[in-house]
Each structure stands twice: as C-alpha cells, then as structure tokens.
A protein has these predicted regions:
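Beta-sandwich/jelly-roll carbohydrate-recognition scaffolds of carbohydrate-active enzymes
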Residues: 84, 91-93, 420-421
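CBM-like carbohydrate-recognition segments
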Residues: 47-70, 123, 331-422
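Low-complexity, Ser/Thr/Pro/Gly-enriched N-terminal "stalk/linker" regions
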Residues: 23-78, 84, 88, 108-113
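Aromatic-lined, polymer-binding surfaces characteristic
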Residues: 75, 86-89, 103-255, 261-269, ...
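Long, charge-dense tracts
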Residues: 98-99
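Bacterial Sec-dependent N-terminal signal peptides
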Residues: 1-25
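Non-catalytic carbohydrate-binding regions of carbohydrate-active enzymes
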Residues: 263, 267-361, 387-403
Length: 422
C-alpha cells in the first residue's frame, strides 16, 4: 500500500512537468509568430498576382467616403506597400526550415508579381499612367528594391527592368503635394540613381531640403508647413528621408551636398532613434498603441521607424533588442492573433482592429492597409541575430506600470548627442 502511495505521488509530480514540457514544445517563438503573420498577409496577394489573378480575386473594400478616384489604385497600393515591408525578409538565403520554405515561396511569387505589375499584357498590369496616387505606391515599390536590391531587383529580366525604369521615369508628370509626398518623388528618383538609370537630382535634393526645413525638433518632422500629430513620421517621413539620403550621400560618405545644406545622413538617423524611443514608450503594458491621427487603419505601419532601427542595427542605447522585440511582438499578437483583420477572402479588411470601415479616410481602400507590413522589417535579420536571440525584456511602459525601475525620458537636441551609430 505504501508503495502505491509513492507511485501515485510520483505520477502527480510528473504530470505538471510533462504538461509544461509539452507546452514549451508547442509555444511559438517570437520570430515564428512574426513569420506566420507576415506570410498570412502576403500569400493571398502574391499567390494571386504571380498568376495574374489579383484583380480578379481580391475582395476590394473602399472607404464609405471614397472620393471617386479609380478604384484600380487598390491593387498598386496593396502590392507596393506589401513589398516595402516584405523585402528585407526575402533577402535572406534559402534554407530548408519551415520559415525558409515560406520565404522561398513568397520570393518566387514576388518576382513573378513584379513582372506582371509592369507587363501591359498581364491582367494585373498596374495603374501606372492615370491617377496621381500612383506616385505614392511606385515609391513603395522603389523602396522595396532599395531594401532588397540584390534579391528582388537583380533577378528581374532585362525587359522587366526596362519597364520599371520607364514607368518610374514617367511619374515625373506628377506634381507632388507640398507634404510627405515630396519624399515619394525623392524615393523613386533615388532608386533610379542606384540602378544606374537617368535620375533627376533636383527632385531628390529639393525634396530632402524641404523635409529638413520641416524638422520641428525632438525627433519630429512637420508633414508640410503645418504640424499634424499623427503617425506619418513613421509611415513615411523618417524611413524615406533616411533611405533617400543614404543613396545621395553614399551612406554618409559625402557629408556635404552643395544644394542640400543641413541634410545629414547620420543626423537623420539620430533623429529617427529619438523617434524610436518615443514609439517604444507609446506601447502600453497590454500591447496597445494610442489611436490618433489620420490613416490609423494602417495598423502596425505606425511602428515602421522602430522596425527600421532594429533591422539596420541602429537601436539607440536606451532600447535593448529584447525589449523592442517583446513590445512589438505583443502588439502584433494583439492586432493579428485572432484573424479579425482579414476579410473572408484572406485580404486585410478596412478598420483598425477588425472591420471598422467608418474610420477609414476618403482615400483609403483595403489595399492601402498593407502599410501594416512595414512593422516586419526585422525579419530581414537572420534567426540567430541578437534581435531574435536576446532574452525578452519588459518594455518601458510595462516596467513603469508594474512598479519597476525604468529610465527617465530626455528630449533630443543635436548638441547633446548621447547615442551612437554602428
């Protein structure tokens, strides 16, 4: 009888251990969570477009206040914005892991989709030559090539490359609005410059000079002459300003460009670092972000600047890999964990967290929403990079609200540089 008691006791002690062990085996890593969401977002777009079927099969949603522009802008917005966020991940080499197989499939689809996008004979030839909106999403396509030049631009056949250069060049017909749109012209021309095609240096330098004039301090730029408190510093301004500067200054090797006084590549990164600190502090202990400003339906696109800093190994000393990854993961899980942000055909649905078409702006369609992919830039880091392998840590607001010690915040001014650039 005594022996039976010991056996029962041993079984009781072993059950929780086995349960915990099984749970650990089934729990997904942060990277696996990111990969699964990115694949779910990208696969319906690229699997269809690679076959010339995106226009046929995409379940399109337009804002209730749609302004009447050609709804075919939807497909270019969808493809361009998706690729700007997806490009770094597709730059990694092939391997036989589940992630590697996902990535290889997406890259194969993407290369076919790039070709269809500029092939007039393809049903998925995009709306290049009508709406001014085309400039915006051509810039995101150009950005995808800048971010993954060797993996996504170089493999394209010569005819496809010539078609892109022709379409990008033709966009000089668009007079960009006096706002972040200047960066769309600068990004397209910067790509042409990198690709060795004729580029308009004035469109680059004048745009960057104006963005520099609109810097208001402490990591914030004004989106045009009047400041607006929204996420456009992350959606567009910091990333595209840095990436255009990177091309024209050769990553800071040319410190002074004659007609661009004040435009400094390294200083632009330092400002982005300050803005990244602000973004990290905006993430609540529960993994939510403040809902303010226009285009809030772009969801996790609001984190692009933080994602860019992580991907390029530019995180400031205030932010560790573990805390940034943990904070971004909890936001991604909260936003995409239950599938509510996808419609019945698998495409993103109008809303912030679920189907909420009433909050979309007059220019918004569900292709616009693929800005959400821009948070996933760190997937361009290998799985063994410290961003992915460092232990998870509590992020700033989580520490603060749980009564832990946390760092004080300080405004950033050029004369008080405290953070380094690798």
């Amino acid at each position: 009888m005594k022996r039976l008691h010991w056996i029962l006791l041993l079984m009781i002690l072993l059950i929780p251990t086995e349960s915990i062990s099984a749970k650990k085996k089934t729990e997904k890593s942060d990277r696996e969570i990111w990969c699964d969401v990115m694949y779910r977002m990208a696969a319906p777009v690229l699997s269809n477009m690679s076959e010339g079927l995106l226009k046929q099969n995409m379940l399109v949603e337009l804002s209730p206040t749609w302004d009447g522009r050609d709804k075919n802008v939807t497909y270019m917005e969808c493809f361009g914005r998706l690729m700007a966020g997806l490009a770094p991940w597709l730059s990694l080499p092939d391997d036989e892991t589940p992630e590697g197989l996902q990535r290889k499939q997406l890259r194969e689809w993407a290369l076919k989709s790039y070709a269809n996008a500029v092939d007039p004979a393809s049903p998925d030839y995009l709306l290049w030559r009508q709406e001014n909106q085309t400039l915006v999403d051509a810039a995101f396509l150009a950005e995808s090539f800048l971010r993954s030049y060797d993996a996504l631009w170089m493999p394209l056949d010569s005819i496809t490359k010539q078609r892109y250069i022709a379409e990008f060049t033709d966009l000089r017909r668009v007079d960009p609005s006096y706002s972040n749109w200047l960066l769309f012209s600068a990004t397209v021309e910067s790509f042409l410059r990198k690709a060795g095609a004729p580029s308009d240096t004035y469109r680059i330098s004048s745009s960057l000079r104006k963005i520099e004039e609109w810097y208001v301090g402490d990591g914030w730029y004004s989106d045009g002459p009047r400041f607006a408190f929204d996420y456009y510093n992350s959606f567009v301004i910091h990333p595209m300003y840095i990436e255009a500067l990177e091309v024209i200054t050769e990553a800071g090797k040319r410190e002074k460009i004659g007609n661009m006084p004040g435009c400094n590549y390294h200083e632009a990164i330092r400002r982005a670092q300050r803005f990244g600190v602000i973004l990290e502090r905006l993430i609540s202990p529960e993994g939510t972000l403040p809902v303010f400003g226009r285009s809030i339906t772009y969801r996790t696109g609001s984190l692009q600047t933080l994602a860019l800093l992580a991907w390029r190994n530019w995180l400031p000393e205030e932010l560790s890999n573990g805390q940034v990854r943990a904070a971004m993961t909890v936001v991604i899980q909260r936003m995409f964990g239950d599938g509510r942000n996808f419609n019945t055909a698998g495409f993103l649905t109008l809303g912030f967290n679920g189907s909420q078409p009433g909050i979309s702006d007059y220019y918004t369609n569900n292709g616009s929403l693929y800005m959400a992919s821009l948070a996933f830039l760190p997937l361009g880091l290998s799985a063994d990079d410290p961003f992915w392998t460092d232990a998870s840590q509590s992020w700033t607001s989580k520490k603060a609200w749980e009564g832990e010690e946390f760092p004080k915040d300080h405004s950033y001014h050029k004369e008080s540089v405290r953070i380094s650039i690798l």
